[in-house]
Every structure is written in C-alpha cells, then in structure tokens.
Amino acid sequence: MTELKNDRYLRALLKEPVDYTPVWMMRQAGRYLPEYKATRAQAGDFMSLCKNAELASEVTLQPLRRFPLDAAILFSDILTIPDAMGLELRFAAGEGPVFDKPITCKADVEKIGLPDPEGELQYVMNAVRQIRKDLNGDVPLIGFSGSPWTLATYMVEGGSSKAFTKIKKMMYAEPQTLHLLLDKLADSVIEYLNAQIKAGAQSVMVFDTWGGVLTPRDYNLFSLQYMHKIVDGLIRENDGRRVPVTLFTKNGGMWLEQIAATGCDAVGLDWTINIADAKARIGDKVALQGNMDPSMLYASPERIREEVAGILEGFGDAGTGHVFNLGHGIHLDVPPENAGVFVEAVHELSKPYHK
C-alpha cells in the first residue's frame, strides 16, 4: 500500500474519523490561477494541455502549492470519451465545447466503439501516472468521468445546450436509440475509470452535470440506472485500500435517496439543498460532499468564513462522513486569495466538530 501523508479525504468518504473536515474544490486547477493561465499558454490550447502528462501534472499540483487542500483531482475533461469515440471535439472561442460529428441517429450510435483506455485515451492514464509520481504521497488523487447522460447530452446536442431539445427529442421519440448510446457510454466509463484506478487514482467521481434537467421518471430511466451500472462495475479495492466512489448530480437534491441506493460511498451536493436536510435523509448510508455556492467566493473573507461555519454547523457534531467542497466548479474570476480563505476556514472551523 502506498503511504499517504494526508489521507483525511479518503477516510471522510468512508465515514471514518478525521481530526478536521477535509476540503478540495471542483475545478481547483483552473483559470482563476495566473500560473494556470501561463501553463495553458505554454501548451497552446486546452486539449494540448490535457494530452501533455507533464503539463497536466503541473496544473493539477498548482492549487496544492497555494492552498492546504486535502486532495488533488486529475486535470482532464469529461468529454475525453466522446472525443475518443471519433466525434472530433474542439473548443470554440466563446462557445465552449463543440463536436464536429455529433450523434444524430441510430446508425451513428451503432458505429461508435468503446475507446481503449490505454489506446486512444492513454494520454489520460499517462497523466494519472505522472501526477501520482509528482504528488509523492502528499494527498490522494481523484479520477473522474462524466455520467453517461451528461456525455450523451453533449454528443447529441453537438456541444453545450440550454434547452436540450435534440437529446430530449431522441429520448421521447427514439428511446431505444438513446438507451443504446447510454449503455455504450456506461461500459466505456467503467473501463475508463477502472483504468484510472489501475494507473493510480485513489478515488473516483462521476459528474452528472445535466441530470437535473430531467423529470423524476426520466432521471431514473436515463441517468441513474446507468450510474448504478457504473458503480457495480468499478474496482473498489486497489493497492490494499478501498477506492471510494462519489456520484454528483447537479440539481439532484430531490433524488438523494435513489443516488445513495446505488452503492456509492459518497453523494455530492450542490448549493440548492441544505446539508442538514441531506444528512437527515441519507447521512446514515453515505458520506456527503459539498456544498457552498461557488459565488460565495466573491464575498468578503468574513462572509466566506460565516458561510463555511454555517455549513459545518448544518452537518453537525457527528463530524465523520463530510468532505467540504463547493456546490459546483470555482468561477474563473474568483480572487485566488478568497479560495485560500475558504480552505483555511474549513480546516480551522471544523476542528471542534471532530473532538
């Protein structure tokens, strides 16, 4: 077993005792840091940065040099799988991700194969291996993927969407086509995350960014059942240690019980749910991750500390089973010093809850 100097994040996910609440931030390696912008400029563009193991490791470690974070997260993108399936991902200025060959019909779905994690996606595994080496056992490394539903939204819409009309048209007019796509994606995510674990990821997270646009019935049919399949297919022990799995559905507060029933170790919360309510509903079954509004990082240091204190109080005295995080990714124009206030406030203010 690889010795970790700080394993609080892993212990909290498994509801084991810790001496303070561990914290990391979604998108903690990113554009709010000037050093990230410099490294990205050196790489040339976003995907070139992802595909260079040394530079991907550099940007993964940058926030850890600034802040006493309790975990590192692989620097990559959720759209690596569809890109490797041949949909030709590019990032257009002002538009975000665009697929030049989107999925439009059943024939398109039948044509795509499962990418080889050590073939078309080997650059991701190389980054995992490099990051683990460079971390030198300081903190655990989180691997991740998008959920099948969320990946499918980009693949069918051809990029980002506000109304999701194309994928919902497929969902209601050709549900069997969408299920075929989601099933392929679930198999691909299982292979991809298991390869990340074998390469060195010590925990994995599935981001279901767009699950919250579905009706309760459709959420279960088109998103949750495929995340359940992923949880069932993942390696859960590696290098002598359990590999915790976190599921996160943005705007998924109404489905916490169903998410917890998948067999995951932790459920990610966005800021639209009260953490005390979430704990009352599922805290006996899983750990919780979250859940400060990322926009709170625009506030004064005093207000940030006040918000952290309120969330810690909401989680309460039984201080095991909470990983502090934002409710979604940090915004690109947040002052880095405010992120530092946040991280240090979590450590300082959580200690009384862990006596």
Curated annotation (Swiss-Prot):
Recorded metabolic or biological pathway in which this protein acts: Porphyrin-containing compound metabolism; protoporphyrin-IX biosynthesis; coproporphyrinogen-III from 5-aminolevulinate: step 4/4
Subcellular location field: Cytoplasm
Annotated site, Transition state stabilizer, chain positions: D77
SUPFAM superfamilies: UROD/MetE-like
Key words, A-Z: Cytoplasm, Decarboxylase, Lyase, Porphyrin biosynthesis
Molecular functions per Gene Ontology: uroporphyrinogen decarboxylase activity
GO terms under cellular component: cytosol
Keyword Glycoprotein: no
The EC number(s) this enzyme carries: 4.1.1.37
Residues where substrate binds: R27, Q28, A29, G30, R31, D77, Y154, T209, H328
Location (main, coarse): cytoplasm
Reaction(s) the record says it catalyses: uroporphyrinogen III + 4 H(+) = coproporphyrinogen III + 4 CO2
InterPro entries: UROD/MetE-like_sf, Uroporphyrinogen_deCO2ase_HemE, Uroporphyrinogen_deCOase
Pfam families: URO-D
GO biological process entries: protoporphyrinogen IX biosynthetic process from glutamate
Keyword Cytoplasm included in the entry's annotation: yes
Function: Catalyzes the decarboxylation of four acetate groups of uroporphyrinogen-III to yield coproporphyrinogen-III.
UniProt similarity note: Belongs to the uroporphyrinogen decarboxylase family.
Subunit structure: Homodimer.
PANTHER family on file: METHYLTETRAHYDROFOLATE:HOMOCYSTEINE METHYLTRANSFERASE RELATED, UROPORPHYRINOGEN DECARBOXYLASE
Protein name according to UniProt: Uroporphyrinogen decarboxylase
Species, as recorded: Vibrio campbellii (strain ATCC BAA-1116)
Organismal lineage: Bacteria, Pseudomonadati, Pseudomonadota, Gammaproteobacteria, Vibrionales
